[in-house]
UniProtKB/Swiss-Prot annotation:
<dbReference type="GO" id="GO:0005978">
    <property type="term" value="P:glycogen biosynthetic process"/>
</dbReference>
<dbReference type="InterPro" id="IPR004193">
    <property type="entry name" value="Glyco_hydro_13_N"/>
</dbReference>
<dbReference type="InterPro" id="IPR037439">
    <property type="entry name" value="Branching_enzy"/>
</dbReference>
<dbReference type="GO" id="GO:0003844">
    <property type="term" value="F:1,4-alpha-glucan branching enzyme activity"/>
</dbReference>
<dbReference type="Pfam" id="PF00128">
    <property type="entry name" value="Alpha-amylase"/>
</dbReference>
<feature type="region of interest" description="Disordered">
    <location>
        <begin position="619"/>
        <end position="645"/>
    </location>
</feature>
<keyword id="KW-0808">Transferase</keyword>
<feature type="active site" description="Nucleophile">
    <location>
        <position position="309"/>
    </location>
</feature>
<dbReference type="GO" id="GO:0005829">
    <property type="term" value="C:cytosol"/>
</dbReference>
<dbReference type="GO" id="GO:0004553">
    <property type="term" value="F:hydrolase activity, hydrolyzing O-glycosyl compounds"/>
</dbReference>
<feature type="active site" description="Proton donor">
    <location>
        <position position="352"/>
    </location>
</feature>
<dbReference type="InterPro" id="IPR006047">
    <property type="entry name" value="Glyco_hydro_13_cat_dom"/>
</dbReference>
<comment type="function">
    <text>Catalyzes the formation of the alpha-1,6-glucosidic linkages in glycogen by scission of a 1,4-alpha-linked oligosaccharide from growing alpha-1,4-glucan chains and the subsequent attachment of the oligosaccharide to the alpha-1,6 position.</text>
</comment>
<dbReference type="Pfam" id="PF02806">
    <property type="entry name" value="Alpha-amylase_C"/>
</dbReference>
<comment type="similarity">
    <text>Belongs to the glycosyl hydrolase 13 family. GlgB subfamily.</text>
</comment>
<keyword id="KW-0328">Glycosyltransferase</keyword>
<comment type="subunit">
    <text>Monomer.</text>
</comment>
């Protein structure tokens, strides 16, 4: 991609039209002009009185390198010869009030390591990618009908060196990727990697949207990390925050002394909960900045998806007591998704949205927002409230576990067990579970069993896979020493077996977004807090029966209605001794009794373990999908909710 001489750009292309390559105009680009090598600096500051480029190269002297205003709408530019890569710089902006303020470059692709705040000249081009095979394989699959298991992580606290320092992007490739491959995750989702000044914002309060944070290395180092992920078949999703940004003095806030990237109206500009300000999504230059940024990460870093943060905050004006929709945000999100999918139709655009806004994952031409996935925040909140309740009282909130199936097919959902629920005093997943030490592990195994068998793609925050006891501590790494304890090793083994079972079992993901993929067997047994259901694949013989017991009681010879196959095998039981359970399992082949039960043609009698999940698979006859009498087996469906895509 070539740098565009801003003097040749029609002003309408950036100021009034859709222009999604603005990173080719703005920022610091190493170029040769009039046979001299140097750097061209270009910036948009519509209300600046004067502009200069300052840095070590001119001893930060505002008078030496004055910029030229090349459009009436406030594009400023300057070519400075003999400046090389890794030079640090800022823009010195004289405001209309006569003050001079120093700002980092909004389009800089590299920055100093915090606490320093200057931008750094860096040639983003030149990395040689080796992921063509990944791209080809990705295009051959439909993400909607594939298994998806996402490992959410915070780069700075997954693991640290013995001296407490951070692993670099390249070192994380060596440490993290084998771990992710071992656990058979299909994707990793990384909390924001844009440049940000404050570690404890976790990257959600950014200053440099085009700069991969220098905490972990250079942009090329991050490209290497993504390249290695693709080499081993792992997709990379980034958290991306197009709704709001931080108010640090060197960043976008009041960039030229006036609201430039943010709304002018104080009532909607400020975001008091987070101490940030909201992007003015009705301004064409801001839209071009953000959509260009999304495409920049796709094109230069080969990212496979974005989890778009805080969509609810964008969809509604944040005036106190007001729930009026923000039409600027609605049209921006539609424009964003159209641009992204025009670039890559296989991309993952996931909305983190806690509202009931309709058609979030419907195409824009059907009136939707155009995402292809949405976090199911309602499922997460309901299920965790249910699990935190004492088992003997769960029967009174039985609907917490069934309600999600009333809307499971209204959107394309990802089920998140995310970082939001294991921080700020909310406890870890393991420690949310009531009861004694054994009870906690048994119920977490049960939760994971329900999680992997419920319709929807899967996301788990780091540490959950081995039962992190403490909630997430963002300044420390995970408690890897817990592997010294038997129950945590059991938990880890169980999780790896569960995810492997999920990936090889088509009924658990093939019809995730179709109501034909799920059928309740018994959703109404609140007295015993037992749930049973069927997951169905494309083929009628691809069916699994799932039974979940959310109390500590054990049940012998418990009747469960099943589709009319002759035999069933238990393929997973969370109470197996090898997972730390009590060993109440169904070892023998289960013969289906040809008597209707639970609105099914037959039933089996099984042992239901305490706090246990049991997964049963029908045993196929020699003729595959046919029973011994020659008739085809059918799974009844009583679900009428509509599916999408």
């Amino acid at each position: 991609m070539s740098v565009i001489n801003c003097e040749e750009v029609k002003r309408d292309e950036f100021h009034t039209e859709k222009y999604y390559e603005s990173y080719n105009i703005f920022g610091a680009h190493i170029v040769t002009e009039d046979e001299m090598r140097g750097v061209r600096f270009t910036v948009w500051a519509p209300h600046a009185k004067a502009m200069s480029v300052v840095g070590d190269f001119n001893e930060w002297d505002y008078e030496q390198h004055k910029m030229l205003q090349v459009t009436e709408e406030g594009i400023w530019s300057l070519f400075i010869p003999h400046i090389e890569e890794r030079e640090i710089y800022k823009y010195a902006i004289e405001t209309m009030a006569g003050d001079v303020i120093l700002k980092a470059d909004p389009y800089a692709v590299y920055a100093e390591v915090r606490p320093n705040t200057a931008s750094v000249v860096f040639d983003i081009k030149g990395y040689e990618w080796n992921d063509k095979n990944w791209s080809r394989k990705k295009k051959k699959k439909s993400v909607y009908k594939e298994a998806m298991t996402v490992y959410e992580l915070h780069f700075g606290s997954w693991k640290k060196k013995e001296d407490g320092t951070l692993y670099s992007y390249r070192e994380m490739a060596e440490e993290l990727i084998p771990y992710v491959v071992e656990h058979q995750f299909t994707h990793i989702e990384i909390m924001p990697l844009v440049e940000h000044p404050y570690d404890r914002s976790w990257g959600y309060q950014g200053t440099g949207y085009y700069a991969a944070t220098s905490r972990f290395g250079t942009p090329h180092d991050l490209m290497h990390f993504v390249d290695e992920c693709h080499k081993y078949g792992i997709g990379v999703i980034l958290d991306w925050v197009p709704g709001h940004f931080c108010k640090d003095a060197h960043g976008l806030y009041l960039f030229d002394g006036t609201p430039t990237y943010e709304y002018k109206d104080k009532d909607v500009q400020e975001n008091p909960v987070w101490g940030t300000v909201n992007f003015d999504l009705g301004k064409r230059e801001v839209r071009n900045f953000l959509i260009s940024n999304a495409l920049f990460w796709m094109r230069y870093f080969h990212i496979d998806g974005f989890r778009v943060d805080a969509v609810a905050n964008m969809l509604y004006w944040n005036k106190e007591g007001q729930e009026q929709s923000n039409e600027h945000a609605v049209s921006f999100l539609r424009e964003l998704n159209e641009a992204v999918f025009a670039e890559d139709e296989d991309f993952l655009m996931t909305a983190e949205d806690s509202t009931a806004w309709p058609l979030v994952t419907a195409p824009t031409y059907e009136g939707g927002l155009g995402f292809n996935y949405k976090w199911n925040m309602g499922w997460m909140n309901d299920v965790l409230k249910y699990m935190e309740c004492a088992p003997e009282y769960r029967k009174y909130i039985h609907d917490k576990m069934t309600f999600s199936l009333l809307y499971a097919y209204s959107e394309n959902f990802i089920l998140p067990l995310s970082h939001d629920e294991v921080v700020h005093g909310k406890k870890s997943l393991l420690n949310k579970m009531p009861g004694d030490y054994w009870d906690k592990f048994a119920q977490l195994r049960l939760l994971y069993g329900y999680f992997f068998t419920h319709p929807g793609k899967k996301l788990l925050f780091m540490g959950g896979e081995f039962g992190q006891f403490d909630e997430w501590k963002d300044l420390e790494d995970l408690d890897w020493n817990l592997h010294d304890f038997e129950m945590h090793r059991y938990m880890h083994d169980y999780f790896k077996e569960l995810i492997a079972l999920y990936k090889r079992s088509k009924p658990l993901w093939q019809l995730d977004h179709s109501p034909e993929g799920f059928q309740w067997i018994d959703a109404n047994n609140n007295e015993q807090s037992i749930f049973s259901f069927i997951r169905q694949g494309d083929k009628q013989e691809d069916a699994l029966v799932v039974v979940c017991n959310f109390t500590k009681a054990t049940y012998e010879n418990y009747k469960v209605g099943v589709p009319d196959f002759e035999y069933y095998n238990e393929i997973l039981n969370s109470d197996a001794e090898q997972y730390g359970g009590s060993g109440q399992v169904n070892k023998k082949r289960l013969k289906a009794i040809q008597e209707p039960y639970h609105n099914q043609a037959a039933h089996v009698e099984i042992t239901i373990p305490p706090f246990g999940v049991s997964i049963l698979r029908p045993v196929k006859t020699r003729k595959g999908s046919k029973k011994q009498d020659g008739s085809k087996t059918k799974v009844r469906s009583n679900v009428t909710s509509r599916g999408k895509r």
